[in-house]
Amino acid sequence: MKFISWNVNGIRACVKKGFLDFFNETDADIFCIQESKMQEGQLDLNLPGYHQYWNYAVKKGYSGTGIFTKEEPISVSYGLGIEEHDQEGRVITLEFKDYYFITVYTPNSQSEL
Protein backbone atom coordinates (compact mmCIF):
# COMPACT_ATOMS: atom_id res chain seq x y z
CA MET A 1 0.00 0.00 0.00
CA LYS A 2 1.29 3.45 -0.88
CA PHE A 3 0.25 6.53 1.05
CA ILE A 4 1.39 10.12 0.97
CA SER A 5 0.91 12.94 3.46
CA TRP A 6 1.65 16.53 2.45
CA ASN A 7 1.22 19.88 4.17
CA VAL A 8 0.21 21.91 1.12
CA ASN A 9 -0.08 25.27 2.94
CA GLY A 10 -3.12 26.17 0.81
CA ILE A 11 -4.56 23.69 -1.69
CA ARG A 12 -5.83 26.29 -4.16
CA ALA A 13 -2.36 27.81 -4.62
CA CYS A 14 -0.87 24.32 -4.73
CA VAL A 15 -3.21 23.30 -7.56
CA LYS A 16 -2.00 26.31 -9.56
CA LYS A 17 1.59 25.11 -9.06
CA GLY A 18 1.06 21.57 -10.42
CA PHE A 19 -0.52 19.60 -7.57
CA LEU A 20 -2.70 17.56 -9.92
CA ASP A 21 0.26 16.41 -12.01
CA PHE A 22 2.12 15.34 -8.88
CA PHE A 23 -0.99 13.66 -7.47
CA ASN A 24 -1.54 11.65 -10.66
CA GLU A 25 2.13 10.66 -10.92
CA THR A 26 2.23 9.26 -7.38
CA ASP A 27 -0.68 6.85 -7.91
CA ALA A 28 -1.05 6.64 -4.11
CA ASP A 29 -3.67 4.40 -2.54
CA ILE A 30 -4.29 7.10 0.06
CA PHE A 31 -3.21 10.74 -0.30
CA CYS A 32 -3.60 13.09 2.67
CA ILE A 33 -3.26 16.84 2.75
CA GLN A 34 -2.98 19.18 5.68
CA GLU A 35 -3.47 22.93 5.88
CA SER A 36 -5.87 23.01 2.93
CA LYS A 37 -6.97 26.54 3.95
CA MET A 38 -10.25 26.40 2.05
CA GLN A 39 -13.97 26.34 2.65
CA GLU A 40 -16.56 23.99 1.20
CA GLY A 41 -17.29 24.78 -2.44
CA GLN A 42 -14.12 26.80 -3.08
CA LEU A 43 -12.44 24.10 -5.13
CA ASP A 44 -13.79 21.24 -7.22
CA LEU A 45 -11.11 18.59 -7.76
CA ASN A 46 -11.98 15.99 -10.38
CA LEU A 47 -9.92 12.95 -9.38
CA PRO A 48 -11.33 9.86 -11.12
CA GLY A 49 -10.87 6.67 -9.13
CA TYR A 50 -10.65 8.46 -5.77
CA HIS A 51 -13.10 9.17 -2.99
CA GLN A 52 -12.56 12.60 -1.38
CA TYR A 53 -13.12 13.59 2.23
CA TRP A 54 -12.59 17.13 3.54
CA ASN A 55 -12.65 18.64 7.01
CA TYR A 56 -12.89 22.44 6.80
CA ALA A 57 -12.01 24.97 9.47
CA VAL A 58 -14.74 27.35 10.57
CA LYS A 59 -12.25 30.22 10.22
CA LYS A 60 -11.64 31.13 6.56
CA GLY A 61 -8.14 30.53 5.20
CA TYR A 62 -7.13 28.43 8.19
CA SER A 63 -5.96 24.82 8.72
CA GLY A 64 -8.18 22.07 7.23
CA THR A 65 -7.46 18.52 6.08
CA GLY A 66 -8.34 16.25 3.18
CA ILE A 67 -8.00 12.58 2.24
CA PHE A 68 -8.22 11.00 -1.20
CA THR A 69 -8.55 7.22 -1.22
CA LYS A 70 -8.98 4.62 -3.95
CA GLU A 71 -10.90 2.27 -1.66
CA GLU A 72 -14.18 3.49 -0.22
CA PRO A 73 -14.09 3.35 3.59
CA ILE A 74 -16.74 1.72 5.74
CA SER A 75 -17.14 4.95 7.71
CA VAL A 76 -15.68 8.44 7.98
CA SER A 77 -15.46 10.62 11.08
CA TYR A 78 -14.34 14.19 11.44
CA GLY A 79 -12.59 15.67 14.45
CA LEU A 80 -11.90 14.37 17.94
CA GLY A 81 -15.23 15.11 19.59
CA ILE A 82 -13.80 18.21 21.29
CA GLU A 83 -15.67 21.22 19.92
CA GLU A 84 -12.88 23.71 20.61
CA HIS A 85 -10.50 21.73 18.39
CA ASP A 86 -12.98 20.30 15.91
CA GLN A 87 -13.79 23.79 14.58
CA GLU A 88 -10.34 23.85 13.01
CA GLY A 89 -10.81 20.86 10.66
CA ARG A 90 -7.68 19.09 11.85
CA VAL A 91 -8.63 15.38 11.90
CA ILE A 92 -10.25 12.89 9.51
CA THR A 93 -10.53 9.19 10.36
CA LEU A 94 -11.39 6.54 7.77
CA GLU A 95 -12.46 3.06 8.84
CA PHE A 96 -11.62 0.20 6.50
CA LYS A 97 -12.23 -3.52 6.93
CA ASP A 98 -8.81 -4.29 8.44
CA TYR A 99 -7.53 -0.91 9.63
CA TYR A 100 -8.19 2.73 10.42
CA PHE A 101 -6.42 5.56 8.61
CA ILE A 102 -6.14 8.99 10.22
CA THR A 103 -4.82 12.28 8.90
CA VAL A 104 -4.04 14.98 11.45
CA TYR A 105 -2.84 18.55 11.14
CA THR A 106 -1.29 19.60 14.45
CA PRO A 107 -0.53 23.21 15.29
CA ASN A 108 3.00 24.35 15.98
CA SER A 109 3.25 24.68 19.76
CA GLN A 110 6.30 26.95 19.57
CA SER A 111 7.94 26.78 23.01
CA GLU A 112 4.68 26.17 24.92
CA LEU A 113 5.22 22.42 25.41
Task: Cite the ranges covered by each PLM segment.
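N-terminal, active-site-proximal structural segment of metallo-dependent hydrolase catalytic domains
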Residues: 1-47, 57, 62
